[in-house]
Amino acid sequence: MDRIVYDRMAAHDSTHWWYRARRDILADYLTREGGLPKDARILEIGCGTGHNLPMLAAFGSVEAIEIDPAAREIAAERLGRPVSNAPLPALPGIERGAYDLIAVLDVVEHIEDDVAALRAMAACLKPGGKILVTVPAHRWMWSAHDVVNHHHRRYSKATLATAISDAGLRSNGLRYFNSLLFPLAAVARVAGRMTGRDDSDDSPPPPVLNRLFETIFRFERHLVGRVPLSPGVSIVTLLSAAGSSAR
């Protein structure tokens, strides 16, 4: 990702509506769908500045990987332990067969060979372990935001399902989320393309709008995995080995 993306993440990940609401949505989703043991060993790959680590720590003992040095330092402070530098798909130095949960939250789209990355993660799971995946949805929503984040792709459900299957994994279901605000996001992307003002700035909006968007997005914690949401800006799923249960 461009340096400015990490800088904005560090500045805004505790206040921006998207980060705050998404953490709550994913926490509820894991509580309902994860089936994790109480002493779960968890690895977040591509943790950025570590804004998801406290949420994941509610489910077990957390370790983390981040390849950007400055972000890794911030994440280590939040985690209270060193954060590894182990790029996908090689994951050098990462123990195989060791984790109950691996979280890759808006990470897989950054990896050129997504199938190899998913296979590498699967090799690090304990029997019955799971991979929590979120990715950006809809190729037609490609924008300057994807460019500065060094995305290789945005996914459809079909392309994500193919990558999952090719990696020898199975999904508990591909669910759209960030759906209630999808019309606004879609209009913004199309308008930006038509006017030539395709802005990559993801700083928080004015406080009133930031609170409003957070409230609307957070409401999806009651819906994701329970009520079909379509379409959405993102897709979430839990993966497990093809021969095991995805629940």
Where are each of the predicted segments found?
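Conserved N-terminal segment of class I S-adenosyl-L-methionine
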Residues: M1-G97, L101-L105, V115-L118, P207, ...
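A C-terminal cap/extension of S-adenosyl-L-methionine-dependent methyltransferases
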Residues: T15, L181-R247
